[in-house]
């Protein structure tokens, strides 16, 4: 059972270790969102 937990923990750790890689795509999405936000800045009411 402990082994299974360890494996699961390792799997969970894998994505955690990929955190530096995850923020990369997130940053890209944020950049796109930011771009949209800037464009929607005129439509702030709509964004709200």
From Swiss-Prot:
| Cell compartments where the protein resides | Spore core
* The organism's place on the tree of life at top rank: Bacteria
Supply the alphabetized keyword list. Sporulation
Composition bias type Basic and acidic residues, residue spans: 1-12
Write out the biased-composition intervals (Basic residues).
31-48
> Alphabetically, which GO biological process terms does the record hold?
asexual sporulation; sporulation resulting in formation of a cellular spore
Which sequence ranges are marked TM in the entry? none
Q: Where is this region: Disordered?
A: 1-48
Looking up InterPro entries in the UniProt record yields: SASP_SspP
Q: What single Pfam family name could you report for this chain, choosing any that match? A: SspP
Task: Explain what induces or represses this protein's expression.
Answer: Expressed only in the forespore compartment of sporulating cells.
Q: Which family does it belong to?
A: Belongs to the SspP family.
Q: What is this protein called?
A: Small, acid-soluble spore protein P
Recorded source organism is Geobacillus kaustophilus (strain HTA426)
